[in-house]
Amino acid sequence: MNRYILIGVVTIISSLAGVSAAYAQSTTLKGHVYTKDGKPAAHVNVLIKEIKRGTVSLEDGSFILENLKEGSYTLFISCIGLQSVERNVHCASNQVCEIDFTLKENETELQEVVVTGSKGLNDRRVSAGKVLIDPMDLPQSTTVIAKNILERQQTLRLSDALMNVNGVYVYGTTGGSQEEIGGRGYAFNNSNTFKNGARYNNAVMPEMSGLEKVEVIKGSAAVLFGNVAAGGVLNLVTKKPRFDQGGELSFRAGSYDLYKPAIDLYGPISKSIAYRVNTSFEKARSFRDEVSSERYYVNPSLLFKLGKKTDVLVEADYLQDKRTSDFGTAAIDYEIADLPRSRFLGASWSYYKTNQSTLTATTTHRINDNWKLNNILSFQQSNIELFGTTRPNASGQMVQSNGDWIRGLQRSKTNEKYYLAQLDLTGQFKTASMKHTLLLGADADRYITDADAFAYINSAIGNKNIYDTINVFDLAKYSQRNDIPNLTSTTLTHTPINRIGVYVQDLVALTEKIKLLAGVRFSYQETGGGYIYNYQNKTETKTDQLSDRAFSPRLGLVYQPTKDISIFSSYSNSFTLNTGTDVNLNPLAPSYIDQYEAGVKTELFGKMLSANITAYQIVNSNLAQMSLTDANGNSNNNANIKELAGEVTSKGLEFDLMSKPIHGFSFIGGYSFNETKYTKSNTYVVGSKLRYNPQHTANASIYYNFNDRGFLKGFNAGILGYYVGERVAGRSTRVQVPNDTYKLMPIPDYFQFDFSVGYTFHQLSLRAKLSNIFNQLSYYVHDDNSINPIAPRQISVTAAVKL
């Protein structure tokens, strides 16, 4: 019933024509900021000196200041590192006053200044929101990890970047091949991870060298995307073509024979076509014995300007990744075994291969200054193959108390194709005295997954899946096999998923201080309707099809007593059509999610420091998670075999701090508290903790740039501290199993400190990073069978030249 009430609220709001108090007669000031070579200048501050009101220019260089009193004003145009510009302007009542500015810098010079980080936490809009809304007007917590942060911290993996976001963390690295991310108590699965606004398969670590920024929307994003899990949404934004000629060549070397050359080139092909090509190659050994990796990445893109109003951006990327599959150390009776950090327990020939390719076309058409159409067409294909020894404690083959472990074999091949079509109309208009920022959209996507299963039967040992026996404490105790057996392909499972959605969202400025965000999405999804082909008896079995449809409403209220304080609250309801099947290969029922969020966003000391605090509660009616056992009661290794575990409730509090550069200093900090428990369940103990989620996380980084400090000019340095609290893994105790042997396994907390230093001289730069300075030890864990130690102390050095 609540959902339908909210739908009605949205409809009423969208049709209002004047029910709030009328504004006094006012004027509007708008214009554009350009570089001296005529290009739009984004992220430039525009300030009215007399009344201390301001804004920031958008990507097209435009700015707008509304509800001004008639009078004369002094406009001050500035950005850290640029020459400021002042102009006097007179604004008449009920008129639109237009004025344009031209900076003294060209586009290249502006790009170099903006990247140094002149924007605060509440200045950074997220493109994943589909409509650009100022964070102070948004009743939701968002974070943007900008290019300058990625560069100065020398991020190599996504986990490095997420150390700047409280409450978002890596909880597992199953097989050493991926980074399983969680937030606010829930996992960010494939449906919650995006690249340039299109869903992205996160079964492999994404390549960071091609990224411009990382966007995080915490909490619900169901109205915008549909079928997303509760914790939040992650959007990876790649580097874009530019109409100025340039680029960078870099080479990175580090501990354990890490070598990574990278090339980034961009420039104009003609007056209306620009290009960018970003490519890298990475090869490394590991602190883990016998483990190595190799990856190649290329990301070409073209930007076509079809007149003044239409842009077409075509982006492609290809990632080839091959690494040793590594399921970490051992656990004995749900306690992590005391083994050397470096000890590898798999076969030396084990591998995990990924080939992933994406093609996306984004068309933007500016109808006029207020309305815009945006279309995304995207295709992605992922081929993933795993072959190696089974995980410790999987398939019933437990590590014994004396360290003996009977190893089996596992192999899987998965091919996934993903298609997306999305169309959005965004615009601004007024009804009476109320200003609307409207989003209307529709999307349709399709997954096709083909998964091959394999079996290994050792006829010499009773037709069991037994490869050999090792002792985890003493690898010399037994003679280890090193041959690669042939595994028989048993079944092919073909699973299509079709989804379509339509949505509307409206941000309504009821008064200058009160804003209402309301939206609703209708989603329809079909899961299943595929088949299972048996290679041995050459039979095909159709799978059941499950279809669901639902409305997902959203309602948020923002109160801004001043321009520097925003108090907000919001409610959203969504449903997740769960992928995968139960142990009997039947489709899963959907999960319904209620989310409540409230908080305060502030800009302090003349907008030099942002400080935000957020509280939330998320209730998942029936959480789908990987099943602990298969249909035969054995330990389950297939991530597509799931169970519905019952109601789970997550409660938490988050605190964020971010400064703009102040005399060379900048600061990022945060703290998160979370408690996620089973609140209704017939499967697990009510009140027991959901696995993998730390109750406390915290982060703090301080960075200093010596740009104007005499002989130290060009030097910069910073330190990052990151804390992850205790959490639990293992297997939750089942209430319906008498004397259940399953139990939770505690994972220790850890503090990690990283130190970075750099030097820039003209076009040359040299950067060094020392990570995990104090050599802290903890683990990324999945169940009790992929317990991967975090990396020890390491050093890396990067040399680069700008072109």
Role assignments for model-derived ranges:
Residues 39-42, 47-52, 66, 80-82, ...:
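Acidic, small-polar-rich N-terminal luminal/periplasmic segments of exported/outer-membrane proteins
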Residues 210-212, 223-300, 306-310, 357, ...:
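Outer-membrane beta-barrel translocator/receptor signature
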Residues 621, 667, 722-739, 758-803:
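C-terminal beta-signal and adjacent terminal beta-strands/loops
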